[in-house]
């Protein structure tokens, strides 16, 4: 009888010990996972340290190069539309992104005489409409974001809203759970 009681109590102790240990581990990781925001001085110091790395040096060279200046100038021409989230008229120049790009699905568009990469993050249901785009289609784009990278010779516009012939063909779906 004692052996049966011990056989029942021993697994109960082992399981309760494991549960207690896992709850302690969860508490420790939750305390560590919330870093405090950096102050302006700390942020500037981190930026200076990064600028001294090989990647930072290459980035600064790119910014000062004619290619970097061209990208910044193209960004400046659409900055008001980006900030105000207003319509930008463009013409699709290519359905393919530059060779070696890792941006996912996108197209090349000419807006006000400058070329841009328009990047999309479509749901599977939205891909069919985006695949219906053709070269020389006139589209209207709205975006909240424009970015750049030394790897690309064009600014990268995140396509939040696209319409063709007064019909919406893409509207970015907000992510679940916030941002």
Language model features with spans:
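OB-fold and OB-like beta-barrel modules that bind single-stranded nucleic acids
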Residues: 87-92, 136-144
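OB-fold/S1-family single-stranded nucleic acid-binding modules
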Residues: 146-178
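Positively charged n-region of N-terminal signal peptides that target proteins for export
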Residues: 1-4
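Structural detector for short beta-strands of small beta-barrel domains
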Residues: 83-103
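N-terminal post-signal-peptidase region of extra-cytosolic proteins
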Residues: 76, 91-95, 118-129
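Short nucleic-acid-contacting surface segments enriched for D/E, G, S/T with interspersed K/R
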Residues: 124-142
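OB/S1-fold single-stranded nucleic-acid-binding modules
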Residues: 6, 17-84, 177-179
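OB-fold (S1/OB) nucleic-acid-binding surfaces
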Residues: 100-120
């Amino acid at each position: 009888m004692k052996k049966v009681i011990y056989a029942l109590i021993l697994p109960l102790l082992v399981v309760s010990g494991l549960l207690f240990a896992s709850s302690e581990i969860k508490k420790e990781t939750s305390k560590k996972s919330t870093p405090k925001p950096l102050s302006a001085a700390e942020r500037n110091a981190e930026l200076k340290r990064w600028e001294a790395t090989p990647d930072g040096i290459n980035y600064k060279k790119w910014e000062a190069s004619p290619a970097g200046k061209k990208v910044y100038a193209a960004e400046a021409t659409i900055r008001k539309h980006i900030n105000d989230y207003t319509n930008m008229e463009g013409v699709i120049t290519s359905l393919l992104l530059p060779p070696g790009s890792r941006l996912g699905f996108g197209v090349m568009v000419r807006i006000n005489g400058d070329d841009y990469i328009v990047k999309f993050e479509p749901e599977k249901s939205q891909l069919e409409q985006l695949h219906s785009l053709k070269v020389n289609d006139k589209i209207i784009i709205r975006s909240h974001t424009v970015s750049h990278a030394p790897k690309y010779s064009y600014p990268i516009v995140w396509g939040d809203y696209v319409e063709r012939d007064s019909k919406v063909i893409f509207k970015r779906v907000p992510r679940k759970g916030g941002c």
